[in-house]
């Protein structure tokens, strides 16, 4: 598929690719290895965006001709495919086919996103209290948090639908314009931000459930040294490309997200030293207080350092000096060639269909 990115999405793709490039650069003290890592990440992301576009467009409404070339989102696709297949092999697990619409039908009002948001918000507020007495003393605040969570669950899907309605004419016009130049290409994809689809009810429910679970796991997991705080805001971006694989199944999405975050916490812990080194160098060069990490602490980022792309590309580039880069080059070229062959076959098939 011919792949184009809007300006915001291109910036997000470059930013995340630059993140891994910067970590490799500061770790190896070699800017060429940094460029290499960033370029490899960029290539793999664009190819995967093309390959996942059909499933993405089929699952989400009004997303025809749209793809998501965002490294963090795409990095969980292989992970989700493997775990989803393993879950399908568990006897009786297929009966737990619960999606947002199924929850509404089965539980009525209690399955509505608004109600779920209130319950989850009140639950999180209650868990933040040290005793039952503190819970009783803070009932107004707990209920307030529940109402805010309910509002988030209800309003975000509506807001994102407005964005989709506004971007749809732009997307269609761009596709028509490019189609005139590439007349034989019928698989044009416009790269957009995953923010367009984070308002899906399953994404909201699973993300909100995983926030307290992730904090709890960060405290009890042996060997983990990372406590996510600001990074929790990026939790929603874990699921845009997982949902097309699980068909929006809440249980499957939660399990995949849980496993991904457990592994991701260890990924972030392993890269924290290099992340901190990069942040200190930036602070010394710019004096920017936002990147100043206090002495005795290390920094990390759950919303990209926890991904398979970041961890894999870093270690194959930095830890395995010769073999690793060769593997990455072979992987990127192999994926690009396979994608090109797939595109050519699809175009030929579509061309023959139109002739008939």
Predicted regions and their residues:
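Hydrophobic core segments of alpha-helical transmembrane domains in multi-pass membrane transport
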Residues: 17-25, 38-50, 116-129, 146-157, ...
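Membrane-embedded hairpin module used as a gating/binding unit in multi-pass transport
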Residues: 81-183
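Membrane-interface helix-loop-helix junctions at boundaries between adjacent transmembrane segments
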Residues: 15-78, 91-112, 137
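Juxtamembrane inter-helical linkers in multi-pass membrane proteins
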Residues: 56-100, 165-193, 282-288, 352-356
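Single conserved hydrophobic/aromatic residue that forms the stacking wall/gate
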Residues: 1-14
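Long, well-ordered mid-to-C-terminal structural blocks that present hydrophobic/aromatic surfaces
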Residues: 145-228
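Transmembrane alpha-helical segments and their short flanking loops
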Residues: 60-66, 133-140, 177-185, 224-356
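Alpha-helical transmembrane segments and their helix-start/interface "positive-inside/aromatic belt" motifs
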Residues: 30-39, 111-114, 141-149, 248-260
């Amino acid at each position: 598929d011919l792949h184009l990115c809007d300006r915001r999405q291109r910036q997000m793709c470059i930013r995340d690719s630059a993140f891994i490039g910067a970590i490799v650069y500061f770790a190896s003290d070699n800017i060429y290895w940094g460029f290499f890592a960033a370029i490899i990440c960029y290539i793999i992301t664009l190819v995967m965006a093309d390959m996942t576009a059909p499933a993405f467009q089929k699952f989400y409404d009004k997303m025809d001709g749209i793809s998501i070339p965002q490294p963090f989102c795409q990095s969980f696709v292989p992970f989700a495919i493997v775990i989803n297949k393993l879950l399908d092999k568990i006897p009786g697990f297929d009966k737990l086919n619960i999606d947002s619409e199924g929850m509404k039908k089965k539980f009525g009002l209690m399955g509505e996103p608004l109600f779920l948001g209130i319950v989850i918000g009140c639950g999180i507020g209650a868990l933040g209290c040290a005793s039952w007495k503190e819970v009783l003393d803070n009932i107004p605040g707990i209920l307030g948090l529940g109402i805010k969570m309910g509002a988030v669950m209800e309003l975000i899907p509506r807001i994102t639908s407005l964005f989709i309605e506004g971007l749809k004419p732009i997307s269609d016009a761009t596709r028509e314009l490019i189609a005139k130049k590439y007349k034989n290409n019928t698989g044009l994809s416009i790269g957009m931000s995953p923010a367009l689809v984070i308002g899906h009810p399953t994404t909201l429910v699973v993300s909100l459930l995983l926030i307290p679970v992730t904090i709890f796991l960060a405290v009890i997991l042996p060997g983990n040294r990372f406590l996510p705080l600001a990074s929790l805001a990026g939790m929603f971006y874990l699921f845009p490309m997982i949902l097309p694989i699980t068909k929006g199944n809440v249980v499957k999405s939660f399990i995949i997200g849980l496993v991904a975050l457990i592994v991701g916490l260890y990924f972030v812990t392993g890269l924290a030293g290099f992340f901190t080194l990069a942040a200190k160098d930036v602070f010394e060069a710019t004096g920017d207080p936002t990147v100043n990490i206090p002495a005795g602490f290390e920094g990390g980022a759950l919303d990209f350092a926890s991904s398979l792309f970041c961890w894999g590309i870093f270690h194959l580039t930095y830890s395995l000096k010769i073999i690793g880069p060769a593997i990455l080059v072979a992987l990127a070229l192999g994926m690009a060639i396979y994608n090109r062959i797939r595109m050519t076959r699809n175009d030929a098939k579509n061309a023959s269909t139109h002739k008939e």
